């Protein structure tokens, strides 16, 4: 048996075990991390040589879900895992975002961390343990790393914080908060919550930070026993003479180029100055060094202006929002639409309503099987005025869409209140920063324009950070793209007037203090109120009527014991209803039936068929049915779908009938009255009493009738 090093802790009432040396022994570092019965294999491999031609940290984090982990066989034709699920992509981003700032920016050797979920107890989410596992392998390895970090999930139920809640506990929780932090600072926050007040959210972040300390202690213990000596950090310095020459050439001109509020004018001015600079110095210095020094001058100008003058290079105040505009109903035919503009950032959001059958089917390790609300974020190249390849959404697009989706879920009506599947598409048509929060604003308005009865409007804002010497800092409201690029933090907050619905915090520094967190959260609240006022002017309440082009949903209830009658053998009956009426039909286990149709006539037709299928035949009632079979002694008539009765030959007419065929033939529609339902549930019918209301029906025992030829069919003597 292979000997492994094992380390244990009890976290949140469940055992956490990190083991190294048993699997993936050829990787630079590898651990298995198990929490309760959820287990992951986390590996790190580093290239031996720097990657040529890159000016960034080449870190790749892959999060892979194995379906066997939950005892599943993958769907699809080939029955094996394919491209990562949306949840796997988000889990990979959850790991990448806090670790990247803690690795040296100068590192050019490719790093690959692969997180593989190899066991899932379907109770505990594996994502945060991917973060802890990745931090552990970096801590053990030779790679320079300013961790370790801990990652904790926090729920809030019945006035108490819950550490690492299960899927079942999260369903009852008011928040789903993930915090990643080092010993002293927070490096990543992600939250979805049901309008949580700002002060409570800050307390929850503090609670998670404290819980992370034990995970950091555990990794320090592992490093002490298994850690390798760290490699030196590469030095990538721009020669001093280049920096001096560039600074002298652009002195005073950088601020002038950056002063334009219009993004296009600003970029043109910056590029024009860059061209002059390169032309003037290219014969003396390397172009790469010139461009790097110029980039530092731009960064210095942006940051120093904010820190020293409390104003931005384009003249906007520290807490001043860009020009806002909101408009709804901008497109014909669609079910709902809106356009939200903030400066040069514009997002068009479209709402499409469908039946509950159109909910997304999830094939992964998450607790959910279906999703009735989807928000898809698209970022086209033209939104930044660039020429780029346009293809399927990448990790960034999926992450931004998930954030906006999470922000809106708390205000959505339940399926019982609004039995629709809702698809949102947020198309970014102009980008100068904070498009994800623009997507929240435009999508909120689009939902209301579509007539979705959302509880409240939701708005989002991004708060930036510029840090200086001696722990000085400045938080700035509504950051533009250039401030995001040269700043230290992107603190996104979405919510209503009554609280926070989503947070996502990414940063370039090695963590932020609780003073920064507090300032950012309350600064976002102030800005959110201003944005909501602008949105209210466009549309303050959801429309009371759906678009004429949206499907209508009609809800009825049937006896749960009759569900089988509606579905039919192998779904034959329900498929027939859908085809006949051009509707959608969704049936819940409690007998709730939702019919979706583009017009009321089709819906009512489907409703009638379903009601007839589930209706009990009553003695004395009159029905119009179709003759299905003819015997020598009478005719069988289907009076309700799947329910036949017999009209004896003596009850076919108000005169003597010699042959049944003289009065009716198969396919004829006749009106009959139920005269009797015998002890075996067989239905006796009379046409004679319809033709002659004064006639008295004859009670008869069908067992005394002549035996007919032909095979026995159960429906000949039953309700079915």
From Swiss-Prot:
Its cofactor is Mg(2+). Residues 551-610 form the KH domain. It is found in: Cytoplasm. Residues 620-688 form the S1 motif domain. GO terms for biological process: mRNA catabolic process; RNA processing. It catalyses: RNA(n+1) + phosphate = RNA(n) + a ribonucleoside 5'-diphosphate. It comes from the Bacteria. SUPFAM superfamilies: Eukaryotic type KH-domain (KH-domain type I), Nucleic acid-binding proteins, Polynucleotide phosphorylase/guanosine pentaphosphate synthase (PNPase/GPSI), domain 3, Ribonuclease PH domain 2-like, Ribosomal protein S5 domain 2-like. Mg(2+) binds at residues 484, 490. Its EC number is 2.7.7.8. HAMAP family: PNPase. Involved in mRNA degradation. Catalyzes the phosphorolysis of single-stranded polyribonucleotides processively in the 3'- to 5'-direction. NCBIfam families: polynuc_phos, PRK11824.1. This is Polyribonucleotide nucleotidyltransferase. It comes from Dehalococcoides mccartyi (strain ATCC BAA-2266 / KCTC 15142 / 195) (Dehalococcoides ethenogenes (strain 195)). The gene is pnp.
């Amino acid at each position: 048996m292979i000997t492994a090093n094992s380390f244990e802790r009890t976290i949140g009432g469940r055992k956490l075990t990190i083991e190294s040396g048993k699997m993936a022994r050829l990787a630079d570092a590898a651990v298995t991390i198990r929490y309760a019965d959820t287990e992951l294999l986390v590996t790190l491999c580093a290239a031996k040589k720097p990657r040529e031609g890159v000016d960034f940290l080449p870190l790749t984090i892959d999060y892979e879900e194995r379906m066997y982990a939950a005892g599943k066989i993958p769907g699809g034709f080939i029955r094996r895992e394919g491209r990562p699920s949306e949840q796997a992509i988000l889990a990979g981003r959850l790991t990448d975002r806090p670790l990247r700032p803690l690795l040296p920016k100068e590192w050019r050797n490719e790093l690959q961390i692969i997180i593989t979920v190899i066991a899932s107890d379907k109770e505990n989410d594996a994502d945060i343990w991917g973060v802890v596992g990745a931090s552990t392998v970096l801590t053990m390895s030779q790679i320079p790393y300013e961790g370790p970090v801990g990652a904790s999930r926090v729920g809030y139920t019945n006035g108490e914080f819950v550490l690492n809640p299960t899927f079942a506990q999260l369903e009852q929780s008011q928040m789903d908060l993930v915090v990643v932090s080092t010993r002293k600072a927070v490096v990543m926050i992600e939250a979805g919550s049901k309008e949580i007040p700002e002060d409570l959210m800050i307390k929850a972040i503090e609670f998670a930070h404290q819980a992370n300390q034990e995970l950091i202690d555990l990794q320090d213990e592992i490093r002490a026993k298994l850690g390798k000596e760290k490699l030196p950090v590469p030095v990538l310095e721009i020669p001093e003479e280049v920096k001096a020459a560039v600074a002298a050439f652009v002195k005073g001109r950088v601020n002038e180029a950056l002063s334009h509020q219009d993004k296009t004018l600003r970029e043109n001015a910056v590029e024009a100055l860059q061209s002059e600079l390169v032309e003037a110095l290219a014969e003396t210095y390397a172009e790469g060094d010139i461009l790097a020094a110029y980039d530092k001058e731009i960064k210095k100008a942006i940051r120093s202006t904010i820190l020293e003058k409390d104003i931005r290079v384009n003249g906007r105040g520290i807490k001043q929002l860009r020009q806002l505009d909101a408009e709804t109903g901008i497109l014909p035919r669609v079910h709902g639409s809106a356009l939200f503009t903030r400066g040069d950032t514009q997002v068009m959001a479209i709402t499409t309503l469908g039946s509950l059958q159109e909910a997304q089917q999830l094939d992964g390790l998450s607790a959910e099987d279906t999703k009735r609300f989807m928000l898809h974020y698209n970022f086209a190249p033209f939104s930044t005025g660039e020429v780029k390849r346009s293809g399927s959404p990448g990790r960034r697009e999926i992450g931004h869409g998930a954030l906006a989706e999470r922000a809106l879920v708390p205000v959505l009506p339940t399926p019982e209140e609004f039995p629709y599947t809702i698809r949102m598409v947020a198309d970014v048509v102009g980008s100068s920063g904070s498009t994800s929060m623009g997507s929240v604003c435009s999508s909120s308005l689009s939902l209301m324009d579509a007539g979705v009865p959302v509880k409240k409007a939701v708005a989002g804002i991004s708060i930036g950070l510029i840090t200086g010497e001696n722990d000085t800092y400045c938080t700035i409201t509504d950051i533009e793209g250039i401030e995001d690029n040269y700043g230290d933090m992107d603190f996104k907050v979405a919510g209503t007037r009554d609280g926070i619905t989503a947070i996502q915090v990414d940063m370039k520094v090695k963590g932020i203090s609780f003073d920064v967190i507090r300032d950012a959260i309350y600064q976002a609240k102030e800005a959110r109120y201003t944005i909501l006022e602008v949105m209210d002017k466009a549309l303050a309440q959801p429309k009371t009527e759906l678009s004429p082009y949206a499907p209508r949903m009609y809800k009825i209830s049937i006896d749960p014991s009759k569900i089988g009658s509606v579905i039919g053998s192998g779904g034959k009956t329900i498929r027939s209803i859908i085809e006949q009426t051009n509707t959608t039909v969704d049936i819940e286990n409690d007998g709730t039936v939702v019919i979706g149709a583009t017009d009321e006539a089709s819906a009512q037709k489907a409703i009638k068929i379903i009601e007839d299928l589930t209706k009990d035949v009553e003695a004395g009632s009159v029905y119009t049915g179709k003759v299905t079979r003819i015997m020598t002694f009478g005719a069988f008539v289907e009076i309700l779908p799947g329910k036949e009765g017999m009209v004896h030959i003596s009850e076919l007419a108000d005169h003597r009938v010699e042959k049944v065929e003289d009065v009716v033939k198969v396919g004829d529609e006749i009106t009959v009255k139920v005269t009797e339902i015998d002890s075996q549930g067989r239905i006796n019918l009379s046409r004679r009493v319809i033709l002659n209301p004064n006639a008295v029906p004859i009670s008869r025992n069908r067992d005394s009738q002549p035996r007919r030829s032909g095979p026995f069919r159960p429906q000949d003597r039953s309700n079915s």
